[in-house]
UniProtKB/Swiss-Prot annotation:
It catalyses: 1-(5-phospho-beta-D-ribosyl)-ATP + H2O = 1-(5-phospho-beta-D-ribosyl)-5'-AMP + diphosphate + H(+). Its EC number is 3.6.1.31. It is found in: Cytoplasm. This is Phosphoribosyl-ATP pyrophosphatase. It holds the Pfam family PRA-PH. Keywords: Amino-acid biosynthesis, ATP-binding, Cytoplasm, Histidine biosynthesis, Hydrolase, Nucleotide-binding. The keyword Nucleotide-binding applies. It comes from Pseudomonas putida (strain ATCC 47054 / DSM 6125 / CFBP 8728 / NCIMB 11950 / KT2440). One of its GO terms (cellular component) is cytoplasm.
Length: 111
């Protein structure tokens, strides 16, 4: 896994023990999963809007910035759920060489 993701995962874990007023991430953890998910939803919308704008303007700086926010808040969510980014990377690795249609067909049906 990239050094950046490892370092970020370590910081996110440290922030779980921090006082809510000591950092943005600590405050998110303190507010709970619903607040983290709300923020993740906001970042998703901002990323979509930035992508649409970039398609027209050909300026990709905002979509890169917003995607970084989206990834960051996704990592906060995973950390809050006790999951490490490596689990996502492992899943992506598992999908290499597997067609998207085959992967979707192989999933267990949701209840």
């Amino acid at each position: 896994m990239s050094d950046t993701l490892n370092r970020l995962a370590e910081v996110l874990e440290e922030r779980k023990q921090a006082a809510p007023d000591s950092s943005y991430v600590a405050s998110l953890y303190h507010k709970g999963l619903n607040k983290i998910l709300e923020k993740l939803g906001e970042e998703s919308v901002e990323t979509i809007i930035a992508a649409k704008d970039a398609q027209i303007s050909k300026d990709y700086s905002d979509v890169i910035y917003e995607t970084a926010d989206l990834w960051f808040h996704s990592l906060v969510m995973l950390s809050a759920l006790g999951q490490h980014p490596q689990a996502v990377l492992d899943e992506l690795e598992r999908r290499f060489g597997l067609s998207g249609h085959d992967e979707k067909a192989a999933r267990q049906p949701s209840a």
